UniProtKB/Swiss-Prot annotation:
The keyword Manganese does not apply. Keywords: Amidation, Antibiotic, Antimicrobial, Disulfide bond, Signal. This is Paralithocin 3. It comes from Paralithodes camtschaticus (Red king crab). Residues 1-23 form the signal peptide.
Length: 76
């Protein structure tokens, strides 16, 4: 039974390892969507944020609602 347990543990680690690596490579807050993040980035000014993760922070700092269409324009 000993060797079987070792093999089972190794199998679990091998399956889980890629998922753990993916989670580590994407630190910081998660955006609702990349489109929303980019729109917020444009509203704040492109120079404010250069990376995807920083765009999320930029959107939060900017405190602006993402623009999705003409329906958001008053008087139209």
């Amino acid at each position: 039974m000993g060797p079987m347990k070792v093999l089972l543990v190794m199998l679990v680690v091998m399956v889980a390892a890629p998922h753990i690596a993916d989670a580590r490579s994407q630190p910081g807050p998660t955006c609702p969507s990349s489109v929303q993040a980019i729109l917020c980035d444009n509203r704040c000014g492109r120079s404010a944020c250069s990376y995807y993760i920083e765009r999320c922070a930029c959107c939060a700092k900017c405190n602006r609602i993402p623009y999705y269409g003409a329906s958001n324009h008053p008087g139209r």
